[in-house]
Amino acid sequence: VDRTGYKAGALDSAMDAVEGEFIAIFDADFEPEADFLQRTMPYFEDEKIGVVQTRWGHTNKQYSILTELQAFGLNGHFAVEQGGRTASGHFINFNGTGGIWRKKCIEDAGGWEHDTLTEDLDLSYRAQLKGWKFKYCEHVVAPAELPITMSALKSQQHRWMKGGAECFRKMAWRILTFKGVKASDKIHGLSHLFNSSVFVFIL
């Protein structure tokens, strides 16, 4: 099995086999509702929309204090961060799963690249610098499982933290020097990419 690029490599390899205009992405532990497409696809009537991201649900929230705390944090991320970003027009990101991409948007932004651990964050910024818009849907929920052990949670957070730092290093200069982006949006975007450093204190 060719594991080059891991998830990003798999997504990149699958692009040639995609015949449709849109790509729904779910991790293995996600259980989208039957009407997921009916509730999300209408947003793509706006041809400038490249991504529709939905809110994550938590099928095992009540498992332990650890899962309840994770659910609380993730709910805050989606309601406050993602909701605020989409409302204000700041940079926003696809969360890696529970959403739909327009294939043309992926291709226009340069495709899935393998040089960061958070390929979703990387592609999100490249797409928005190309002029694509993202839509966050708070009212559409994609249920999934939360890590149930501290070791699994630490591994997940380490990937997110390292990937965020890699994206900051990769994209910071490009964002700073990009014409057509307001100074306030640049500051917000750089802060967004750099904020993964707070997980050092969590872990």
Per-region residue spans from a language model:
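Glycine-/small-residue-rich active-site loops that bind phosphorylated ligands and cofactors
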Residues: 2-3, 32, 142-145
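Long helical/loop segments within the catalytic core of UDP-sugar-dependent glycosyltransferases
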Residues: 3-22, 34-117, 128-129, 150-190, ...
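Catalytic donor-sugar/metal-binding loop of nucleotide-sugar-dependent glycosyltransferases
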Residues: 115, 124-142, 200
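Active-site donor/metal-binding and catalytic loop motifs
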Residues: 138-152
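Membrane-embedded multi-pass helical conduit in multi-pass membrane proteins
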Residues: 195-203
